[in-house]
């Protein structure tokens, strides 16, 4: 298959919907020779910040000299972003070849039972694990797709698990309370395997503590056993002190990145107990070198243009606070949100820095329409317009902006991906 044909086949699997459970992915991987058993791993779940934590952890491990893998989702601009080895995205050719191999196994599975048809995410996960095995990855950092307990990635046996802060999300699949969602995310905790968490809310943390105790998994908490201090946040980066280490400046903006750095640090200091050595200099160098686009990403000055993928009210509040601190308290918001998110809560959170907004609908069949998003924004803002696409909204905003204006694109990875693709002159795919 050529690249476009491969993407067409993969995206066609989305018609299978979301099927939580490990049976199909386990069978698919078995037919492929169990590639996930050929590398060691770190597993990261949570709601806000798990992608950043994964990127930081991978950068730390690579700085120590390990051959690394990084599996995250979804992507911003190009599908190949999801699967990386030692900082390099899978090539289109490698993706096509592995997809062709996996497709053969999928077709064989379907001959046995139509119920065995793997989903888009299960197939993508299998491709990632096969690529890691072929590339000789020593330690892969794997981000959960949804939840944790029944997520396709939960077939790995990690050296450490991590759980970021938890919010209400995917309630139709994970449950309608923080306790239920925490139980699903804590499903990645393995017997005797260290777990670190940034969660400190009574409901969710209580569930994590209970499951960790039941599985005799040593638990370390950011802000308790894992100490950190946010030293400074500027447009040049975020300076943080982790434990007894010297201060380090991350090239990522936002106070919230200090907590993510603390969680990555917690992972790094737990790994030696599993025989995976990580030096202090690797921690510092990895954090200095980390790159993670779309997270309070400053893409232009005069006018100021910032992209952020925040998609929960908690995330939006954190971003709004950082935007106010770094750029002032008046911004034009371009917002596009998926329909399984708390649109009203997100709109309300961003209203603290904006009374002007352009509502859009990202190119996803799960997105709120521009009209629905605009209706939510009008509850909190007075100047709200709607645009037919993210690209048109951004081009219009930039064309009419003065040098002192601030433009924020937010609400979803899909929204930011389309904005980034337009900004860089590419097509999101």
What are the roles of these predicted feature ranges?
Residues 146-150, 157-216, 343-344:
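Conserved catalytic-core segment of NTP-binding enzymes
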């Amino acid at each position: 298959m050529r690249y476009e044909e491969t993407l067409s086949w993969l995206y066609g699997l989305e018609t299978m919907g979301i099927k939580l459970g490990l049976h199909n992915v386990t069978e698919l991987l078995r037919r492929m020779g169990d590639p996930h058993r050929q590398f060691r791993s770190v597993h990261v779940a949570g709601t806000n910040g798990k992608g950043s934590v994964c990127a930081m952890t991978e950068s730390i491990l690579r700085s120590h000299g390990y051959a690394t893998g990084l599996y995250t989702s979804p992507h911003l601009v190009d599908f190949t972003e999801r699967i990386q080895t030692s900082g390099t995205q899978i090539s289109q050719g490698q993706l096509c070849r592995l997809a062709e191999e996996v497709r053969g196994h999928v077709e064989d599975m379907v001959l046995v039972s139509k119920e065995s048809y793997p989903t888009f995410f299960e197939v993508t996960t299998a491709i990632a694990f096969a690529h890691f095995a072929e590339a000789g990855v020593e330690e892969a950092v794997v981000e959960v797709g949804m939840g944790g307990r029944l997520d396709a990635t939960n077939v790995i046996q990690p050296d450490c698990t991590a759980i970021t802060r938890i919010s209400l999300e995917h309630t139709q699949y994970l449950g309608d309370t923080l306790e239920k969602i925490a139980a699903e995310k804590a499903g990645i905790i393995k017997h005797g395997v260290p777990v670190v968490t940034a969660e400190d809310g009574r409901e969710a943390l209580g569930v994590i503590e209970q499951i960790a105790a039941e599985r005799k998994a040593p638990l370390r908490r950011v802000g308790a056993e894992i100490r950190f201090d946010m030293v400074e946040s500027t447009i040049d980066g975020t300076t943080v002190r982790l434990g007894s280490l010297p201060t380090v400046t991350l090239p990522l903006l936002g106070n919230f990145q200090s907590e993510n750095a603390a969680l990555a640090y917690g992972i790094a200091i737990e790994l030696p107990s599993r025989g995976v050595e990580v030096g202090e200099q690797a921690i510092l160098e990895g954090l200095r070198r980390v790159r993670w686009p779309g997270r309070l990403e400053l893409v232009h000055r005069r006018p100021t243009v910032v992209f952020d993928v925040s998609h929960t009210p908690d995330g939006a509040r954190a971003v709004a606070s950082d935007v106010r601190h770094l750029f002032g308290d008046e911004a034009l918001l371009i917002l596009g949100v998926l329909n399984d998110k708390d649109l009203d809560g997100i709109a309300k959170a961003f209203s603290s820095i904006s009374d002007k907004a352009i509502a859009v609908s990202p190119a996803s069949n799960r997105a709120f329409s521009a009209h629905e998003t605009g209706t939510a924004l009008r509850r909190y803002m007075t100047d709200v317009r709607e645009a037919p696409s993210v690209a048109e909204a951004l081009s219009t905003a930039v064309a009419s902006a003065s040098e002192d204006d601030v433009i924020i694109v937010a609400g979803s990875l899909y929204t930011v991906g389309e904005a980034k693709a337009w900004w860089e002159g590419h097509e999101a795919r």
